[in-house]
Amino acid sequence: MTSVQNHQQQLSGNNKLKKSYLIYAVSLLLGVSACAPKSGVLRAPSNPGQVSTSAAEEAKKAEEKAAEKEAAARDKKDAAQRNISLLLPFQLDHIGAEGVQENDVKRSALALDFYQGFQLGLNELAKKSDSFNLKVVDSKDNAYYNSTIATSEDISNSGIIVGPIYPIEIKAFGNSLPDKEKLIISPLAASPASEFGLNNLVTITPSITSHTNGLAKRVAKDYITGDIIIIYNTSDNDSRQFLNGMLASIKENKENVKIISVSTLSQLNENLSTTGTNLVVSGTTDKTQLNNLISNLSKKNSEEYNSIKLYGHPLWDRFDFSNHTNFYSLRPVITTESNLKSWTSTTRNFRDTYKAKFGIYPSDQSYKGYDVAVYFGSLINKYGVDNLRSNLTKEPYTGLFNTYKFDYNEKWGFTNEAVSYKEYLNGSFQLQ
């Protein structure tokens, strides 16, 4: 296994050169660590001329040996409480003889950013408690290699594992890990946890189902007697996936609601209420369908007897709605995994610290790495590794980028159900 202990290098120069330098430094450290000899305990040679036939002495030696073995096991377990393995796809094995190139930088950027944020999180915790021993492993984005890592001594001696991050890696690693009680933190994959079937998996990124349930909760909260909820179904995959279970989830949050489902704009128009607010829920990301919906609702909303509020898919955050000048009047709301408030002092301090340390500004992955380190490190400090499972669902967290609120399923482990909300204001979706 190629791995590197917790080392950092100061970056300098332009952004590409800075990342190239760090990749080069990490690759050197990985190589050194992989080739470093293992140290052992030196023992004195036995004295063949000294023989004891005393049963009492033999029994005493056996007791001492058992006590030493028990103490060694206890020390190993105690040390593992502070050991964290971080598995990220640096893919340093792809670097050619000519050295680090631009493609190498791009390929490793996600891993580097997460690693650097994670490191700053551990540094923050070290100010108030004992430091953690971080073992960084290049997972190489290779399923077979991940299956071999899972059975390594480094993993066995770790309290928790953060990573791998890609679905194919997670499956290979999780299925090969001998200790099914050891938590695997999936920090970035958005795939539903049900795809992996690992009850020791902790999925950080909210799934699309979590977004569905989150929006349903918001719609139910906004609903008052006299309103009507209209679920607008379209044929695109994103819409079908997002709206699957929406009606049931809304009713689970508020039983006595007036709610209908439609599949055409004419049906939608026929069911618009002129007395209460029309809470229209759409999951489409098809541009034609979305443009037609917005144009239709904007026209209806301009009529003084209609009041419309629109709820949509989280991917709407990536779209440009500037061609719909009255889009804001629909008061659109979407869910988001991000809780990043760039204007807060905490976020600004992290941003400045990151820039001073690495010479570049943090990316979303950097913030996510920081949150994962602070949350799980804090819980280990508070409860110990052995008690993490029993306390994850009891400990919500509001970080720089993410919020955490975990639910547990005995088939696929812990899933983060926390989402935030954005409303369209001044030309973009903004956190509320």
Residue positions per predicted region:
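Extracytosolic ligand-binding ectodomains
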Residues: 2-31, 35-432
